[in-house]
Amino acid sequence: MPDTPGLLVSVRTADEVDDALAGGADLIDVKEPARGALGIAEPEVVGAVVEKVNGRVPVSAALGEWGPTALTEAHWHLELKLDYVKWGLAGYPHTPGWGEDLLDARRGLPAGMEMVAVAYADWERAKSIPPAEVAKFAKRFRFRAVLIDTCVKDAKTLLDFIKPAELAELVDGLKRVYTKVAVGGSLRPEQLPKLKGVVPDYFAVRGSACAGGKRDGVIDKSRVKKWKEAIG
């Protein structure tokens, strides 16, 4: 795995793809920020992004928070040529045997499409599963990708909920079993010096790559470039 992390940029529309790629994005993600941390975009939007990227980099899609209707709501998305799909676990019951429904869904994914296990660092606010438990689950069931993120998008960032040393331990433990790890959580480029010991496969960004630093803004190529330069 590379020593220098790549950059995952979440776009809202196909119109943002060119600026994201020109700024140096190594993976394009699709989400609708107005619908939450992992807000699901309309399938037509996701399809247009896949078409615009045209195989230049991998493409992932956020599909909302997992629940009884999650697969139905994502039916058309799962027909698209996506490399990764992910559901958040906000409100997910932390009970013995949790995750069996996720494993069932993963088995039904098209060939070549991977499910990303999502760990919310602010798991208490999200009423979700603790990150260490998600990491253990991902290792046990050989998930090929994990996202460490925050659920509630406010003035706080990932570092308000997890210490760099703890984050590094999670990331390194997953990478040792050949799981790709993306780290998000409303981070800003100027916070990277605090994360010197954290080497994920990708830093995942949206708000700090948008004009005005607002996640509901539009992708700004210069801000994407700033991230690439900060990563090194």
Pin down the residues of each PLM region:
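Glycine-rich beta-to-alpha transition loops that act as phosphate-gripper elements at the mouths
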Residues: 3, 7-15, 60-71, 119-124, ...
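Glycine-rich, positively charged N-terminal anion/phosphate-binding segment
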Residues: 14, 37-53
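Generic hydrophobic/aromatic pocket-lining and core-packing "Φ" positions
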Residues: 17, 46, 71-75, 135, ...
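N-terminal glycine-rich anion-binding loops that anchor highly charged ligand groups
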Residues: 18-29
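Conserved, mostly hydrophobic/aromatic
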Residues: 20, 146, 195, 227
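Glycine-rich phosphate-binding active-site loops on the catalytic face of alpha/beta enzymes
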Residues: 27-38, 80-95, 145-155, 198-224
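Conserved anion-binding
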Residues: 54-159, 169, 173-177
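Active-site-adjacent loop and "lid" segments of alpha/beta metabolic enzymes
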Residues: 157-162, 189-197
